[in-house]
């Protein structure tokens, strides 16, 4: 009698199939996790930008002479506040880390915080997901007095 040791071909195929199924489930779960993490990072950056710009403008209205941690004088215009915010906020875009998240533009790219001005108002808009549908946009307006 032979004493066979080892696995049969069927046993090996079953193990490979099980590993394949587990890998497929893991990849799908991981992709969902990263998508929600990028959206949450975009929302957080939007909130931080609004708070930062508001706080700096408020400091200026209380008599502070310097603006956004630089030697710039406090802004008399919303445009100068936008320029200061874009130059000092260097967070990376979670959807494209080769670009900064905060930009002075009206274009809407996923993960980008667009800071613009009109008259005495600074507007902060953020697209939180790819596609930028109306439910994926955050907007805040800050008045510069």
Task: Tell me the role of every PLM-derived stretch.
Residues 1-47:
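Amphipathic alpha-helical segments typified by the pilin-like N-terminal helix
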């Amino acid at each position: 009698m032979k004493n066979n040791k080892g696995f049969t071909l069927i046993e090996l195929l079953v193990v490979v199939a099980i590993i394949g199924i587990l890998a497929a489930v893991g990849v799908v779960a991981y992709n969902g996790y990263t998508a929600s993490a990028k959206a949450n990072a975009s929302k957080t950056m939007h909130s931080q930008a609004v708070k930062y710009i508001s706080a700096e403008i408020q400091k200026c209205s209380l008599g502070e002479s310097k603006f956004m941690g630089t030697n710039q004088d406090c802004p008399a215009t919303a445009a100068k506040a936008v320029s200061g915010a874009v130059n000092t906020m260097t967070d990376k875009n979670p959807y494209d880390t080769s670009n900064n998240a905060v930009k002075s533009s009206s274009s809407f790219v996923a993960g980008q915080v667009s800071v613009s001005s009109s008259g005495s108002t600074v507007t902060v808009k953020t697209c939180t997901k790819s596609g930028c549908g109306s439910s994926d946009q955050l907007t805040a307006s800050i008045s510069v007095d």
